[in-house]
Amino acid sequence: TRAGLTNIHPERISSEHDSRIARLTGKADRVLVDAPCSGLGTLRRNPDLKYRQSPETVAKLLEQQHSILDAAAKLVKPQGRLVYATCSVLPEENEMQVERFLEEHPEYELLDCAELLAGLKIDLNTGKYLRLDSAKHQTDGFFAAVLRRR
């Protein structure tokens, strides 16, 4: 790879119902959930998006996100990490989704994104969660949480 890493085996799992989940249970060091979301963090580039989302469509997304996170959690081995990311600015899709996950999965803990980034010499000081704001960071709205399996 470009990064010079040779022990990476990416698996694109496009559904929480994928048959490979059973085979990969407890084997992944890192799992990225790029969750389907309302996309409301991209409003500056997609202003019509606000007319395509409704409380009903967001409610469906919330359940899908929950299901995907639940399935992804099974893939991570002890001390492995699960990253949950959206391009939404809605707390329901972000912090609240992660808090619900942590309540249902006591084997996981939330890592502090600001500390992780500081260790890489990136000073965003966003707190426990990585939350990018279009006004403050000159980018789309973005959210990420890093969870570690105990």
List each language-model region with its residue ranges.
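S-adenosylmethionine
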Residues: 1-150
